[in-house]
Every structure is written in C-alpha cells, then in structure tokens.
Amino acid sequence: MSTYKIAVVVGSLRKDSFNRKLANAIVKLAPPEFSFKQVQIGDLPLYNQDDDDNQAESVKRLKNEIKGSDGLLFVTPEYNRSIPGVLKNAIDHASRPYGQNAWARKPAGVIGASIGVIGTAIAQQHLRNVLACLDVPTLGQPEAFIYVKDGLF
C-alpha cells in the first residue's frame, strides 16, 4: 500500500489554537495510507523580494518540506475576513523566486475553525483564490466552516 505524504500548514501561531487542534483531529481520523507532517511557519522572516537570492534557512526548510509532500492540508483561522498574515507570508516565501514555486501542482484541502458564526468561510475563499494563482488544485467539495463552541476540542 502506498503512503501519501501530506504537509499540514496551520495558519495560527496561538499556543492553544483551535486550528492546530483541528489539524491534530484530522490526522487522528485519517486513513492509514496518509502520513502527515505539520510544517513550521512561525520562524519565517517577513517576505522581502530582495532576499530571493539568499533565502533564510527556515525558508529553505519550508520549501523542501512542501516539495517532499504529495499533497497539502491548509488549516486556517479567519482574521478580519481573511487569512492570517503568517500564512500569507509562508505562501509568499514558498512561491518565490519566480519560477521556483514549491506549491505548484500539489493538491490541497482547505479547512478551518473560528468562534465566528460563519466559521472561516471568507478566509477559506481568499485562500482558495491565492492557491489558484499558484497552480494549487484545491478540493472544491465538501466545504467545512467550523464554528467553535466550548467543548468542541
């Protein structure tokens, strides 16, 4: 049986993150032919195109982990009706320099959890738009917008 390596990108740095808990729950419930690795994004410098020719070690690590995966799982909160800056920063780093997009052609799932009544619906749509630009095919259905209440995790 083949094992599919999935890179998990959690768009939250919060210690008690709902989205990290959601990612952990997905990993526990997944079929055995999937292996998951959460990629670290909190140590990346802010993206600056001037650094494309001399990328930080943390950026090189991120790009290698993405390139070594068979697929992606993005688990994102929603901040002010969009994705968190830390997630966009990671996406920008791994897509650069031009022509060296580590995300390209990696199939992806998108999910998220929030205390807002619409969950992460708008953040997920924004993320899907960004990923489409980067040639990342995303699973269109089903969509899951998780409204977090006490006791969910």
Identify the function of each model-found stretch.
Residues 10, 40, 112:
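Short beta-strand/turn micro-motifs composed of small residues
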